[in-house]
A protein has these predicted regions:
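Conserved class I S-adenosyl-L-methionine
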Residues: 264-274
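Conserved SAM-binding loop of SAM-dependent methyltransferases across substrates and taxa
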Residues: 275-287
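Conserved SAM-binding motif I beta-strand of class I
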Residues: 288-293
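A conserved beta-strand element that flanks and buttresses the S-adenosyl-L-methionine
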Residues: 348
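A short, conserved alpha-helix within the catalytic core of class I
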Residues: 355-371
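Conserved beta-strand signature within the Rossmann-like core of class I S-adenosyl-L-methionine
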Residues: 370-385
Length: 439
């Protein structure tokens, strides 16, 4: 930490705000430690924050995760004002999920309350939180993906153009998105047409604390009223119509449970987790689990269940494995790709391989090579062509997958892994494999 942050940091620590936020589980804790090398003259403190098991990004969150992060941000502002402080920004990238809920990880996001100044994070909050939540709730939940394109938040004029006309009846959305976008356009026009480079830009009017509090409360009310209910999609209902009889399902669950107890991993990634049944088996084995699925309804149901049951070892995430989050931002160095964030000890890939290899035409050796980048140990289920689910996939297309056999699967995966164990799942034609990555 440089000396330019000294006054605000000292205020955070002396005002009692830090203790309140940490005690309520709203902020990661930190320790002040000795600097690792000779500090510069600008050095003030070296902080060692509590570590986050998995760093996620807003475009990987389900609706309720983004909503909870938005409500946390507004709660942080309210608590900060009670301690004569304020948030300097409202970036969702300052929020991570820890022990089942959102927390702020940026200790330096707080400053001494700037008397009379408008709430500076207002635009950022509307672009990063209110606009995507409104679009997901009022138009289409898949519009969350715009956050992957617009790293600085969804432009408000774009959000306004995408929202249905009936949203004009919603006062909060009309004010904070449509009128806000119109003000931005007029502000930019005024700034660009003023004569001379030194012409004064339009000045914001002073805003009292009461007015800032009212603004924050109005945003909070707007966010709380936005909702999205996961409908019965193909994937959300997948487990109720899977290929397993009760005995087969229990055998598969038992095999997965036994493997995980034997492996005792610290972190597990469950790819294609659906609503998280096997993620919870991994969590019961003591692992911290990241539970990925491409279906917004599955991720939403998974998160709601985890939140309801206070499952603090489980983190649901929205991710399309055949189009995973890439490295983004300047020089591809601001947001890491999924593979760059891989810290799992074990990857679960259950009832998944046929969707990747057949539905998406990904060669088996390529699947194996990518999974080997994610973890040293793999627990994967092979689903043969004779399985009803694969028959359904092939019913409307030509079978151009001659190597999609058990022998072809093993040959492809042995290029990247050593097959340690293969167990036929009782009452089915599926096989569960335990594999270890080759050196």
């Amino acid at each position: 930490m440089n000396r330019r942050y000294a006054d605000d940091y000292d205020k955070l620590m002396s005002s009692g705000l830090y203790e309140v936020l940490v005690s309520k589980g709203l902020m990661v804790s930190h320790e002040e430690v000795e600097p690792p090398q000779s500090p510069s003259v600008e050095h003030y403190r070296t902080l060692l924050p509590e570590q986050i098991p998995f760093v996620s990004y807003p475009y990987e969150w389900c609706f309720s995760q983004l909503k909870d992060a938005a409500l946390l941000t507004l709660r942080l502002q309210r608590l900060a004002m009670q301690h004569d402080m304020s948030l300097k920004d409202s970036s969702p990238y300052n929020i991570q999920f820890l022990r089942g809920g959102p927390v702020i990880i940026d200790t330096l996001s707080f400053e001494t309350y700037p008397e009379g100044r408008p709430w500076v994070p207002y635009r950022q909050f509307c672009q990063h939180f209110l606009a995507p939540l409104a679009l997901m709730a009022k138009r289409d939940v898949r519009l969350l993906g715009l956050l992957r394109v617009h790293l600085d938040g969804i432009p408000l004029d774009l959000a306004a153009s995408l929202l249905p006309m009936r949203s004009l009846l919603n006062r909060s959305l009309s004010v904070h998105i449509r009128l806000h976008a119109r003000y931005q356009r007029s502000y930019q026009a005024a700034a660009s047409t003023d004569a001379g480079e030194d012409a004064a830009a339009p000045q914001a009017k002073p805003l009292s604390r009461a007015a800032v509090s009212n603004l924050v409360e109005d945003l909070r009310s707007a966010v709380r009223k936005l909702d999205w209910s996961p409908m019965g999609t193909e994937w959300a209902d997948y487990s109720s119509g899977d290929s397993y009889e009760k005995d087969s399902l229990e055998h598969k669950q038992s095999l997965v449970r036994d493997h995980l107890r034997e492996l005792a991993p610290n972190q597990v990634w469950d790819l294609g987790a659906n609503t998280g049944a096997y993620s919870r088996i991994a969590a019961e084995a003591g692992a911290s689990v990241v539970s990925f699925d491409m279906d917004p309804a599955c991720a939403e149901q998974n998160y709601r269940e985890a939140r309801k049951n206070k499952e603090d070892k489980l983190l649901p995430q929205l991710l399309d494995l055949v189009n995973p989050s890439p490295a983004l931002g300047w020089a591809h160095d601001e947001r890491s790709s999924l593979a760059e964030r891989a810290q799992a000890d074990v990857v679960l890939a259950l009832a998944l391989i046929h969707h990747i290899a057949i539905s998406n035409n990904v060669p088996l050796p390529s699947v194996a090579a990518y999974l080997a980048r994610l973890a040293p140990t793999l627990l994967i289920e092979f689903v043969p062509k004779t399985d009803p689910k694969v028959k359904t996939l092939l019913a409307t297309r030509e079978d151009v997958f001659p190597r999609y056999t058990r022998e072809g699967f093993e040959a492809a995966f042995e290029q990247s892994f050593e097959i340690c164990r293969a167990t036929d799942i009782r009452g089915s034609e599926r096989t569960l494999y335990l594999m270890r990555r080759r050196p």
